[in-house]
């Protein structure tokens, strides 16, 4: 509206001056800005429509499908040679609408071969790889067979790096065909395998953390078909869901913990341990199944040579386990919202025991699982096992591996983080190898809420330093969070996969859409994609639809790019009504590419302080915005983002303070009223008083309201117009667009 008035009013003036109507539209010099509303709020963020597989609302479509795989594994642990050997039967069901002439399997242990791609690209001192260990790494696979309905199937196989291809003579049929693959395999457990699997020497024996321990099916989906990115260590996993039965044979003096339910506790515990195990299922307090004092007591284990521990986990994408004769073992009941129960378990060497370490492990596991279950989605597994070992922190369904030397808040932090991964990616099965931020970032976000609640804030995290975050944005050395984990510098993984996406969700929840709407949409996303495979676009659509907001501007600026945020206060000016101070206009500029809501704290002369919030929508078509604040009292100070809740990378322009000369006296405009003419322009301007305000009008044109600026000056801000009266109020000089014109009051 204001721009229309400016054009109509000054086309008349300037056309008479120079005959050039376009000259009338010159604007005052604008603050230098990198912000482009058309870029930030550009439409067509989604380049494809929803379909019957993945709906436009972000939920799975009516014909969404995914394949299924079940595993049956028997394995042996040799604690002298540090080897795992076993036999696996894979039952694979093709629910896709496609025929499958070949199948792809993941052979993650092959990354530790000296001939592997992972070995070749892993730099010295990396967290990944085998930490320089020289050993005969990788799988040794024998006796592969393929069958359908007990009949043998002709096939050939090929191993390429960390992948195996099974080439079928006859393709698997679409929509439900089932095939069975069986093989024997073995491998040497690395001392440190990409900080995800390992064996640790303690004073009472070796602690084995066994993961990536069996050939797994790759995912075939409606996005890429076969997902065959090799395993190099940085990118984690993308796995199909199904049931996993596994039996682990170890020396009898070992205790084994694993994913899912322990099916035969009566066969592997002593009588006293079984009694304690069952008691723990009914206890909210920690029950010591095997105490620190009992670890070195031979009577604390059955007097046998070998024992087989049997586990089953259902509707899971993976399984892991740990074995040691050095374990202290604790447990307690987990209470779930539905009334169901699970079991919190902590297995750790005596070096990690104590109330300042994993002696509180069960307490931490229980609290973490109960919090996430009531807040987001119920925990699905019968046990939740923490193992203290040489791995700094790694998650698997129903079991996690944590750093054995951690203490106090670090123990809570690693347990809570790794069990938070139950929801991302164990339940919501995103593709970690391509989009690591979809599990690490989401998990980092929910960890903050969990830690705030635990034990009345015992380990409450420090608030996010948003202005520090803002200074990091746009730094090209930090790369982009949408890169694949294996495609970014290792030093940037923490920032891009964990911190920045976590901050993004925190911003959305606290500053942009609000907690109630965010939480509802986020829970709907989890519920809709539980045990399925969402993409980033599915997530973005889910949040848009669930919150009722088009958040394309946010996904574009924060996730797809790393745009900077910089808002500034340009000026604070009073306005009058009925010849009295009626309020102020506060001009805020958006100087960088990322828009954000405006948060202003206004302090009045009396000491009264008020905070107002302006939605991000004001930036849809503006690079600056006038915030109108009604008050009859003088403003002493204005601060942008006073509590530092927005990632503004430049706080130097966020504060305006009165210089003491800004006291507003109500000018008497009665002496200014009348009709004015200019010798240079054959036009008349009539100044009138309307609702106490000074207005200007050219015959036949809309009326403009002039705002008092200072001294004898009035302005029309949007048009860049200044009207400065003579001291005797018999005339004024009108300035706009670099031109000045003298008007004199008619007699």
Spans of features found by a protein language model:
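Peripheral terminal and inter-domain segments
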Residues: 595, 604-608, 613-615, 622, ...
């Amino acid at each position: 509206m204001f721009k229309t008035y400016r054009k109509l009013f000054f086309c008349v003036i300037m056309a008479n001056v120079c005959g050039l109507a376009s000259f009338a539209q010159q604007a005052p010099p604008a603050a230098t800005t990198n912000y482009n509303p058309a870029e930030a709020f550009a439409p067509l963020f989604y380049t494809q429509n929803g379909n019957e597989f993945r709906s436009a609302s972000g939920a799975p479509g009516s014909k969404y499908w995914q394949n299924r795989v079940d595993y049956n594994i028997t394995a042996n642990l040799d604690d002298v040679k540090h080897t795992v050997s076993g036999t696996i039967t894979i039952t694979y069901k093709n629910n896709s609408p496609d025929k499958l002439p070949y199948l792809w399997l993941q052979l993650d242990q092959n990354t530790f071969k000296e001939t592997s791609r992972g070995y070749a690209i892993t730099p010295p001192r990396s967290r990944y790889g085998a930490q320089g260990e020289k050993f005969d790494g990788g799988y040794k696979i024998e006796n592969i067979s393929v069958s359908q309905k007990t009949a043998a199937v002709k096939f050939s196989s090929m191993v390429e790096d960390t992948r195996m291809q099974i080439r079928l003579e006859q393709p698997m049929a679409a929509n439900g065909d089932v095939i069975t693959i069986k093989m024997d395999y073995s491998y040497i457990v690395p001392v440190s395998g990409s900080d995800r699997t390992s064996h640790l020497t303690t004073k009472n024996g070796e602690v084995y953390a066994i993961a990536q321990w069996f050939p797994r099916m790759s995912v075939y989906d409606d996005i890429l078909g076969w997902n065959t990115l090799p395993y190099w260590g940085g990118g984690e996993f993308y796995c199909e869901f199904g049931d996993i039965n596994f039996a682990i044979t170890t020396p009898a003096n070992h205790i084994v913990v694993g994913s899912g339910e322990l099916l035969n506790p009566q066969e592997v515990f002593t009588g006293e341990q079984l009694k304690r195990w069952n008691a723990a299922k009914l206890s909210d307090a920690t029950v010591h199944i095997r105490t620190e004092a009992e670890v070195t007591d031979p009577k604390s284990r059955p007097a046998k040579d070998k024992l087989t521990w049997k586990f089953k986990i259902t509707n899971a994408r993976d399984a892991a386990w740990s074995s040691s004769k050095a374990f202290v073992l604790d447990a307690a009941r987990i209470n779930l919202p539905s009334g169901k129960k699970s079991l919190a378990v902590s297995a750790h060497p005596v070096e990690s025991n104590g109330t300042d370490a994993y002696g509180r492990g069960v307490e931490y596991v229980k609290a973490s699982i109960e919090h996430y279950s009531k807040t987001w989605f119920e925990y699905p597994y019968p046990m939740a096992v923490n193992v203290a070992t040489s791995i700094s922190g790694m998650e698997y369904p129903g079991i996690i591996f944590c750093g054995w030397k951690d203490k106090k808040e670090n123990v809570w932090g690693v347990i809570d983080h790794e069990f938070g991964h139950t929801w991302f990616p164990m339940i919501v099965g995103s593709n970690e190898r391509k989009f690591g931020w979809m599990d690490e970032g989401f998990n980092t976000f929910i960890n903050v809420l969990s830690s705030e609640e635990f034990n009345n804030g015992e380990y409450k995290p420090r608030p996010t330093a948003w202005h520090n975050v803002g200074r990091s944005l746009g730094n090209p050395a930090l790369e982009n969070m949408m890169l694949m984990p294996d495609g970014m510098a290792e030093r940037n993984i923490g920032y891009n996969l964990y911190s920045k996406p976590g901050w993004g969700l925190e911003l959305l929840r606290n500053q942009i859409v609000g907690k109630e709407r965010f939480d509802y949409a986020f829970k709907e996303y989890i519920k809709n994609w539980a045990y399925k495979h969402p993409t980033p676009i599915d997530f973005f659509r889910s949040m848009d639809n669930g919150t009722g907001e088009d958040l394309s501007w946010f996904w574009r600026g924060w996730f797809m790019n790393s745009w900077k945020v910089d808002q500034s206060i340009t000026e604070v000016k009073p306005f009058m009504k009925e010849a009295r101070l009626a309020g102020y206009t506060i001009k805020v500029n958006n100087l960088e590419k990322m828009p954000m809501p405006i948060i202003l704290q206004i302090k009045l002369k009396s000491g009264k302080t008020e905070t107002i919030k302006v939605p991000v929508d004001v930036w849809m078509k503006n690079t600056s915005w006038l915030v109108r604040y009604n008050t009859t009292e003088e403003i002493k100070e204005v601060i942008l983002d006073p509590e530092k809740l927005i990632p503004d990378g430049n706080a130097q322009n966020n504060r305006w303070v009165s210089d003491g000369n800004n006291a507003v006296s109500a000018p008497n405009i009665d002496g200014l009223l009348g009709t004015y003419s200019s010798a240079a322009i054959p036009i008349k301007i009539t100044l009138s008083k309307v609702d106490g305000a000074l207005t200007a009008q050219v015959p036949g044109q809309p009326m403009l309201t002039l705002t008092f600026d200072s001294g004898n000056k009035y302005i029309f801000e949007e048009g860049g117009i200044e009207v400065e009266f003579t001291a005797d109020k018999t005339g004024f000089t009108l300035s706009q667009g670099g031109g000045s014109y003298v008007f004199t009051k008619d007699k």
